[in-house]
Amino acid sequence: MDVVMKLNNIFSGLPKKKKSKVLGRGIGCGKGKTSGRGHKGQKARSGVSINGFEGGQQSIFTRLPKRGFNSLPKNKYSIINVSLIQRLIDSGKIDNVSAITKEVLYNLGVISSVKQKIKILGDGKLNTTVCIEYDFISKSAKSQVTLLNSLSDSESK
């Protein structure tokens, strides 16, 4: 017997995707009336999902102990060495006569914001006396700099 291929006997194999069941179209369809949700109750209503609720059983995140802690955010400040200030004076970008404020340092691109706190460290050597605004200062830098302080000396670190 010779089988002739015709359009009516082409078989493409099993269906790739199972068709979804139509819900709520009468009791004869098998998923009518309550549409597989059971009778009444919170889960039968719309917008049901209760996160972390396990049917009255103590939920997993209350069963497990608390772990660790959240540390407070660090005070971020820019560190400026005395050698950098001397380099800026030598290059002529800063004159040592007027006070060096946060605005001056911001305009030169030394700090990223005028509101940022500044800590001056004593790495390097200053050849001239300088009046500078700061928030924190090290002892070695304090001996080299004439201070225009934004905090009192008792608060400096």
Curated annotation (Swiss-Prot):
rRNA-binding among keywords: yes
Gene Ontology, cellular component aspect: large ribosomal subunit
Gene name tied to this protein: rplO
Coiled coil spans: none
Record GO biological process: translation
Database matches in NCBIfam families: rplO_bact (TIGR01071)
Protein name: Large ribosomal subunit protein uL15
Keyword vocabulary terms for this entry: Ribonucleoprotein, Ribosomal protein, RNA-binding, rRNA-binding
Subunit organization: Part of the 50S ribosomal subunit.
Function: Binds to the 23S rRNA.
HAMAP family documented for this protein: Ribosomal_uL15 (MF_01341)
Pfam families the record matches: Ribosomal_L27A
Record-annotated disulphide pairs: none
GO molecular-function term, one example from the UniProt record: rRNA binding
Highest taxon listed in the record's lineage: Bacteria
Similarity comment: family membership: Belongs to the universal ribosomal protein uL15 family.
